[in-house]
Amino acid sequence: MPNQGEDCYFFFFYSTCTKGDSCPFRHCEAALGNETVCTLWQEGRCFRQVCRFRHMEIDKKRSEIPCYWENQPTGCQKLNCAFHHNRGRYVDGLFLPPSKTVLPTVPESPEEEVKASQLSVQQNKLSVQSNPSPQLRSVMKVESSENVPSPTHPPVVINAADDDEDDDDQFSEEGDETKTPTLQPTPEVHNGLRVTSVRKPAVNIKQGECLNFGIKTLEEIKSKKMKEKSKKQGEGSSGVSSLLLHPEPVPGPEKENVRTVVRTVTLSTKQGEEPLVRLSLTERLGKRKFSAGGDSDPPLKRSLAQRLGKKVEAPEANIDKTPKRAQVSKSLKERLGMSADPNNEDATEKVNKVGEIHVKTLEEILLERASQKRGELQTKLKTEGPSKTDDSTSGARSSSTIRIKTFSEVLAEKKHRQQEAERQKSKKDTTCIKLKTDSEIKKTVVLPPIVASKGQSEEPAGKTKSMQEVHIKTLEEIKLEKALRVQQSSESSTSSPSQHEATPGARRLLRIAKRTGMKEEKNLQEGNEVDSQSSIRTEAKEASGETTGVDITNIQVKRCETMREKHMQKQQEREKSVLTPLRGDVASCNTQVAEKPVLTAVPGITRHLTKRLPTKSSQKVEVEISGIGDSVLNVKYAAQTLEKRGKAKPKVNVKPSVVKVVSSPKLAPKRKAVEMHPAVIAAVKPLSSSSVLQEPPAKKAAVAVVPLVSEDKSVTVPEAENPRDSLVLPPTQSSSDSSPPEVSGPSSSQMSMKTRRLSSASTGKPQLSVEDDFEKLIWEISGGKLEAEIDLDPGKDEDDLLLELSEMIDS
């Protein structure tokens, strides 16, 4: 195979094949430098081990082509260079004599003398030519050496050398008519590479004169070139493209020199035109300029076939072109072929001044469409509202020329408009804030996730106000609405207790989900009314949720100060009501309270409050037991309000699933209550008049525990003992609606209210499930050892008891 196959291109022409023996093509050193094709190989029967002839189609007589590298500063360094060398050279210490063949003179080419004239210019300008590239002859085998124009163009290799220039020259002379339009852009491609590569920019754009093959003097050729150049500048080729000379075989080194000259030389015109001393940036980068005259045919972006040199029939309108000097003073963006967006119209005006038809690129068309769409958008925005028109027109007025807005600018404008609309709406909201309709308040009570999501409950009202305005609320507005809601609920609560007492027998279902509980706690802490407002909130929600007879929409929102005054009055009333009853009644109240948290562990109502470690300053304990999936017992404990009230008397404040038991941290009442303990259990029974008869076994078991606990501690426990009691006592009041008969004084009405609320919390749920859940809860809290776990040491400090309680919850 290595002997019969084709020659390795890189081995024979560049001696650079690095594959060695693994190369599938033939490496035969005997054939190096030989240009004779093996006829046996052509017939497919060359079996010689060492064949001195080439197993490759030789399409050019390289021995008649001057070596390009001979005239370079480094000289030709190839040991087996097949090209013609006029002088001897040293390669790796070996002297190689000049070539023996004589270069034939070709009389047909009228340009060879011109090339000779360029030799002097080439000497100084061609220092740009860089390293001798190994790809210089990449196209050499494509064309035959005769002057017959080949039907196929040699493939364009970007850094290729001048070996294919002969073919280009043949095209330029004989196939000029068809080839010119195609190759007009080609020089630009190569011009862009001209700084770094030796590739010749393609072909002269001569139209008719090159058909005359008479031998002319140098002066005639130069004058003709200048005339052609003045005619054809601006035809879409660079300013030099008409001056580019097309080498034909020239005797001696002249052809070699001329070849290199063509790449960088620019000649100024004779007829008093401005000399183009330097190529413009467009020409050097190979970008296209607009075509002149009425020729709209060559597009700004050439097709792939044109760029690769395929022949395309061109319109004859190319011949008559008006000179275009306006391109000399183009802006940088225009010379780079990039039209700046704001100057689109200016650029088209310039083109029209010269009398040209401007062929738009795809980018320009897309930009125009985008600008039209944006213009439509702006007109729509103008029609929408006056605030929008101000913003959209201000941008248009600012610049006299039409300015295409970017996407980010449009977004910024929209945001600005929305903010203005928000400001206006917030002003309206602050001036006239009214309560929502009954149904919307029910939404906030029955569907608390709506309350939880920021300001969403406010939006239905906004939509009913005006469907045209889509309003996105700011954080400040949401906070304002929350504060207003807190005020509204607290105000409505002031009227609701009186309604509760007026209708003592009515049952109410209070539907509260998890998140409202958390929100209530947060809002209460923010309002600095931790104890009083939570019960007020519950009453308010009951009233708004279920009492349909009351028209809440007419209640106006009042200021926070008046609310606080009412709360203080209410607290004083409660103090009086708490101070009046006897100690025995107090004990019975506390026992009842201890039972009530058990009732709140209804499976349907779960509220998770964050556990806080007890601190003496706040003296709050939250017991959170989530052992049973649904029922969570939260005992909340606050002695703060007691210190406000001055007297250490207990106040009972019960919310469904959040119970606040307030008791005195003083030890003297504790001891007294221990003495009165027998009254405790006596007072419990009348309260649960309906359910005492049907005591479940769970109750008996739990009541057995109660005396044990109460022997060594009182029922009005300081700080932490009361929560434990509340965990133990059973749910006796889950269905009792009647007010307790034995509780005396104002506390009896209070107790009836609490009992009613508790019964409402558990109505609709079967009592057995409540008791079962409670049994499970007690069993889980105590870990199966009720008496052992719940026994408390009366001598322990309050903090020790609190720590024990938190440890028990954690375990």
UniProtKB/Swiss-Prot annotation:
Pfam families: zf-CCCH_3
UniProt biased composition (Polar residues): 392-403, 750-766
Keywords: Coiled coil, Isopeptide bond, Metal-binding, mRNA transport, Nucleus, Phosphoprotein, Repeat, Transport, Ubl conjugation, Zinc, Zinc-finger
Gene3D superfamilies referenced in this protein's UniProt entry, alphabetically: Zinc finger, CCCH-type
Coiled coil (UniProt feature): 363-424
One Gene Ontology term from the biological process aspect of the record: poly(A)+ mRNA export from nucleus
Bias type Low complexity, positions: 487-499, 730-749
Primary residence: nucleus
ZnF (C3H1-type) ranges: 2-30, 32-58, 61-87
Placement of covalent cross-link Glycyl lysine isopeptide (Lys-Gly) (interchain with G-Cter in SUMO2): K115, K125, K141, K479, K620
Cellular component, GO annotation: nuclear speck
Subcellular location: Nucleus speckle
InterPro entries documented for this protein: Znf-CCCH_3, Znf_CCCH
Ranges of biased composition (kind: Basic and acidic residues): 310-323, 368-391, 418-434
Superkingdom of this protein's organism: Eukaryota
Record carries keyword Ubl conjugation: yes
Keyword Zinc-finger recorded: yes
Composition skew (Acidic residues), residue ranges: 161-176
GO MF term (any one): zinc ion binding
Modified positions (Phosphothreonine) in chain numbering: T322
Phosphoserine found at: S109, S133, S150, S172, S291, S371
Location of region: Disordered: 140-195, 224-258, 286-352, 368-434, 483-550, 716-769
Subunit structure: Interacts with TREX complex components THOC2, DDX39 and POLDIP3; the interactions are ATP-dependent. Interacts with PABPN1; this interaction retains ZC3H11A in nuclear speckles. Interacts with KPNA3.
Function: Through its association with TREX complex components, may participate in the export and post-transcriptional coordination of selected mRNA transcripts, including those required to maintain the metabolic processes in embryonic cells. Binds RNA.
Protein name listed in UniProt: Zinc finger CCCH domain-containing protein 11A
Species for this entry: Pongo abelii (Sumatran orangutan)
Lineage: Eukaryota, Metazoa, Chordata, Craniata, Vertebrata
